């Protein structure tokens, strides 16, 4: 038995200078797991609650001492003495103890940090790397895949202080044969994009996720700049590199009049018009994945978008599904989107995260493992992507150590599997829904 002997919570700082929760889980035998909760900027209304103190005298009200206290007191008392290898039981104890639908008592940030730290401690006690232990928990022991990166190289929306409405413009190095080659391609395009922007007299300051955040005349301009950078790097757009976007449409949807108001370029669309606007962009550029292409509450709009684009474009639900199996189940039944974005802290525990990935895969949806805009050096999502063979990961651009930490962990995992004589396949474009 991998007995839990001590649980410690603390307040640390994330990549935006805001506090977050870090947890340590100690086991008999000296095994320790350490994990931190991430934090989002554009958040779905149905996400599990991130508990903040609201004390304006500390961190402008964003302190997490209440969540930390929950870790050090109620949660610690409930799980000390339990077997860390019973991940589902540990998570359920915390969920039941919290007693709310959205984890608002302790905070999803408290529960998640402990959940992940527990998994890391349990993996250590079994002498397994985290990705291998996650595969065991997932019921797919020994089945691994390296993920195709979706690299956010131009940031807009809530992730940047510029006039670009669409939140993320991403590249996917689909022509690569390995994860390491994919990262090299991504880095080369990123550096060439800096040259393209500088030549146009534009800013090369970066946003929350490490992508550039220039002011541009339109969203199409962002895609044109990326196209130029891809070609400048010596690659063929549509063959070596494909494009993806996160619209984060809820951020510019006007609930009062039902219009999508893109103030950056002075355009306003109905739900169906916005789908056709995106359709035109897909005709002009090899965009193979669109995330949150409608407001989270506009299910009628999502159904229409899925009908129009779903046979050839991966339509990812982030704010739409918030990593929640109840909401995802309803979406699957109604034919809404064809992919889910997976964010640990939207649901608040490893067990529930694995359940969402399984439900998606069983329904023929893809699952894209994702960071948040507020991150730490914690690289657990890299192990999650490999251990569930999810096939795709979204963890930012080729700058900012909080993003690169995940890529470097993927490099280590890929190398370790190769050395063991069990290399994990890199799926390339096949990982993307509608592109196999």
UniProtKB/Swiss-Prot annotation:
GO MF assignments: magnesium ion binding; phosphopyruvate hydratase activity
Cofactors that this protein relies on: Mg(2+)
Annotated pathway: Carbohydrate degradation; glycolysis; pyruvate from D-glyceraldehyde 3-phosphate: step 4/5
Superkingdom, natural source: Bacteria
Catalytic activity: (2R)-2-phosphoglycerate = phosphoenolpyruvate + H2O
Organism of derivation: Haemophilus influenzae (strain ATCC 51907 / DSM 11121 / KW20 / Rd)
Active-site residues, record numbering mapped to chain: 209, 343
Gene Ontology CC: cell surface; extracellular region; phosphopyruvate hydratase complex
Residues that coordinate or bind (2R)-2-phosphoglycerate: 167, 343, 372-373, 394
Name the UniProt record assigns to this protein: Enolase
GO biological process, one term: glycolytic process
């Amino acid at each position: 038995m991998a007995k839990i002997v001590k649980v410690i919570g603390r307040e640390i700082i994330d990549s935006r200078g805001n506090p977050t929760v870090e947890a340590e889980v100690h086991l008999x035998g000296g095994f320790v797991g350490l994990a931190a909760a991430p934090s989002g900027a554009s958040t779905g209304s149905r996400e599990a609650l991130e508990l903040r103190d609201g004390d304006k005298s500390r961190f402008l009200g964003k302190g997490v001492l209440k969540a930390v206290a929950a870790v050090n007191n109620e949660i610690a008392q409930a799980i000390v003495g339990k077997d860390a290898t019973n991940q589902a039981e540990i998570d359920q104890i915390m969920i039941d103890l919290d007693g709310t639908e959205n984890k608002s008592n302790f905070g999803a940030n408290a529960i998640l940090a402990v959940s992940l730290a527990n998994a890391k401690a349990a993996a250590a006690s079994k002498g397994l790397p985290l990705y291998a232990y996650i595969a065991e928990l997932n019921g797919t022991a020994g089945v691994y895949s390296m993920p195709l990166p979706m690299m956010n190289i131009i940031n807009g929306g809530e992730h940047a202080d510029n006039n670009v409405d669409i939140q993320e413009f991403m590249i996917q190095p689909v022509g690569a044969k390995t994860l390491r080659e994919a990262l090299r391609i991504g880095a080369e395009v990123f550096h060439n994009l800096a040259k393209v922007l500088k030549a146009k007299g534009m800013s090369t300051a970066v946003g929350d996720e490490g992508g550039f955040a220039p002011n541009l005349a339109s969203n199409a301009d962002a895609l044109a700049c990326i196209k130029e950078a891809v070609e400048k790097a010596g690659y063929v757009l549509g063959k070596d590199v494909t494009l993806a976007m996160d619209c984060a449409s809820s951020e510019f949807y006007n609930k009062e009049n039902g219009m999508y108001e893109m103030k950056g370029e002075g355009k306003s669309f109905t739900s169906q018009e916005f789908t056709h606007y995106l359709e035109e962009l897909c005709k002009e550029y090899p965009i193979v994945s669109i995330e949150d292409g409608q407001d989270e509450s506009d299910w009628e709009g999502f159904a229409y978008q899925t009908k129009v684009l779903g046979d050839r474009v991966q339509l990812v639900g982030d704010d739409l599904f918030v990593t929640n199996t109840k909401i995802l189940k309803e979406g699957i039944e109604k034919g809404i989107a064809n992919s889910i974005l997976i964010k640990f802290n939207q649901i608040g525990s490893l067990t529930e995260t694995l359940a969402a990935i399984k439900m998606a895969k069983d329904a023929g949806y893809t699952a894209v493992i994702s960071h948040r805009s507020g991150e730490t050096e914690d690289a657990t999502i890299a192990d999650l992507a490999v251990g569930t063979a999810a096939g795709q990961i979204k963890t930012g651009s080729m700058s900012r150590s909080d993003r690169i930490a995940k890529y470097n962990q993927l490099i280590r995992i890929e190398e370790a599997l190769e050395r063991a004589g069990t290399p994990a396949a890199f799926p390339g474009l096949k990982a993307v829904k509608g592109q196999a």
